[in-house]
């Protein structure tokens, strides 16, 4: 049975406040039946130096991605993962992580591909929990389940592929959430990830640059609904927006903002993102600060 929605006034103005929890709410519900806490970080070593009591670790790279094909795990693999982590289908899952929930949002997006009914983010993530001097633990929960059902992944509503992006150029909003240096073509990789360099730099023509970090404040919490609405005021109710970054992790964060905080319908995450686009033969690319025009 899902746990109650966080009643905090700080969340009430969002379109779907039931998709967020505050540190106060999570602290109050620690150890309660029906709650599963997941930590998912870019730095996969952080969990081992202290985590929220009762949290299990989900490694975005080894747990959520297929080990052979560049794709996500299957329904059978997801059910096995949930059972190994002791998560039931009717659990309320709260996910948090480092970097203002980059990878936590990515994990939540993958959980959504499998239709997990109640999955939420901890507003502010790991860093805010620590900044507020809340409890941490080194203990790894020893719990398993055998009841999580096999659910086929449903990509279509929230996932976009390269051909989907090509089909909407110039007709639907396309948002690049990477840094401005990546967008303009000044660099071909993130500064701390030289191994992920691509062959071509720049951005997809017509894409607007709205870096993901514009959606959070200094504490890592999401900005107010009013601030977010101003940031995305060009999106209309009938638009079918696609967001992208480098491999889909930062754009999962923006997908969460648009879908759950602002209630924009039909938003999809192009997880192939620049790693695919910047290495693909004969796809259009533009550089500079202008979105660029639809290729003729």
From Swiss-Prot:
EC numbers: 2.8.1.1
Every Rhodanese domain range: 31-138, 168-286
Active site annotation, chain numbering: 245 (cysteine persulfide intermediate)
InterPro entries linked to this entry: Rhodanese-like_dom, Rhodanese-like_dom_sf, Thiosulfate_sulfurtransferase, Thiosulphate_STrfase_CS
One example GO MF annotation: thiosulfate-cyanide sulfurtransferase activity
Residues annotated for substrate binding in this entry: 250
Reaction(s) this enzyme catalyzes, per UniProt: thiosulfate + hydrogen cyanide = thiocyanate + sulfite + 2 H(+)
Keywords: Repeat, Transferase
Family matches, as PANTHER family: THIOSULFATE SULFURTRANSFERASE
Entry's free-text remark on domains: Contains two rhodanese domains with different primary structures but with near identical secondary structure conformations suggesting a common evolutionary origin. Only the C-terminal rhodanese domain contains the catalytic cysteine residue.
Protein name per its UniProtKB record: Putative thiosulfate sulfurtransferase SseA
Organism taxonomic ancestry: Bacteria, Bacillati, Actinomycetota, Actinomycetes, Mycobacteriales
């Amino acid at each position: 049975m899902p746990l109650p929605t966080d009643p905090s006034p700080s969340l009430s103005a969002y379109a779907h406040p039931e998709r967020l929890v505050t540190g106060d709410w999570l602290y109050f519900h620690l150890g309660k039946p029906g709650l599963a806490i997941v930590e998912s970080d870019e730095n996969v070593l952080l969990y081992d130096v202290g985590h929220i009591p009762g949290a299990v670790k989900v490694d975005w790279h080894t747990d959520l991605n297929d080990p052979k094909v560049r794709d996500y795990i299957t329904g059978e693999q997801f059910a096995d993962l949930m059972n190994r982590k002791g998560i039931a289908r009717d659990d309320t899952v709260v996910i948090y992580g480092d970097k203002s929930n980059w990878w936590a949002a990515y994990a939540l997006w993958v959980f959504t591909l499998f239709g997990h009914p109640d999955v939420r983010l901890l507003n502010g993530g790991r860093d805010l929990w620590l900044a507020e001097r809340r409890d941490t633990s080194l203990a790894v929960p020893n719990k398993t389940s055998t009841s999580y059902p096999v659910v086929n992944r449903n990509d279509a509503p929230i996932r976009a592929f390269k051909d989907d992006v090509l089909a909407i150029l110039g007709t639907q909003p396309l948002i690049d959430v990477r840094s401005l240096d990546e967008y303009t073509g000044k660099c071909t990789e993130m500064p701390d990830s030289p191994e992920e360099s691509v062959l071509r730099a720049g951005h997809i023509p017509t894409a607007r640059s709205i870096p993901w970090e514009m959606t959070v404040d200094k504490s890592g919490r999401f900005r107010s609904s009013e601030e977010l609405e101003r940031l995305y005021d060009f999106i209309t109710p009938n638009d079918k927006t696609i967001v992208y970054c480098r491999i889909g992790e930062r754009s999962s964060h923006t997908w969460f903002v648009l879908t759950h905080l602002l209630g924009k319908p039909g938003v999809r995450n192009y997880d192939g993102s620049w790693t695919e686009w910047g290495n693909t033969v004969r796809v259009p690319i533009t550089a500079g600060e202008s979105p660029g025009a639809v290729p003729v």
